[in-house]
Amino acid sequence: LCLNENLSAEITLQPIKRFKFDAAIIFSDILMLPYGMGQEVGFEKGLGPKLGELNLDKLSNINEDEFNNKLKPVYKSISNISNDPILENKDLIGFVGAPWTILVYMINKMSPKRNLSENFFSDRLLIKKLLVIIEKFLKIHIENQIKAGATIIQIFDSWAGLLKDNISEYIYEPTFNLVNHVKKLRVPVICFPRGIGDYKNFCDVVNPDMVNIDYDVDPNKIIKEIKIP
């Protein structure tokens, strides 16, 4: 469905038509990124995402035009949605996965809820190399969504809570780079570092325009800790 420009557009607009929300979020998936980078991506019923083998050499030499062409239906869908009269005076939210969360899926080849290798965190060189490549193509993916008509970008870090060490290197720094990139494009950016714990420090370092918090976090506490623009 994510690669069917007509159906994904219709699914995106359904909540607007029914509930008159003031913004729509595109129907897509954060795993469109590894798919665009050449890694096989599939979904098993009852099990969730399943990715193919990771070929770092192939990823290091990926052609940007090939990436753009593979994800062309996604951008065409966004363009179709943004031009629909129903979205007049409403925002269209595009999104990506944060570099760390994309890396987790690409290396682990499945949701870490199902299985996370004990040695996952041991190959620091692989992690650092892959984060650089992922960040590069996330920036391209973000730019393409904005060019197609997205007026807000959201960054989902679904597995931020997995890290106990190296949070600055693996989460804060690459996410800050994305946030800064979006701001240069003059588009608001929202972050959701699920399970991060220290939202104040995250916001102080990464400096998003908005932040989502976990369902079990007291919003009154967050309001006192974080500077609200």
Task: Please describe what each predicted stretch is.
Residues 30-33, 48, 57, 99-101:
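A short acidic, glycine/proline-enriched capping/turn motif at secondary-structure boundaries
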Residues 1-43, 83, 87, 172, ...:
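N-terminal basic, low-complexity leaders that serve as flexible interaction/assembly modules and, when applicable
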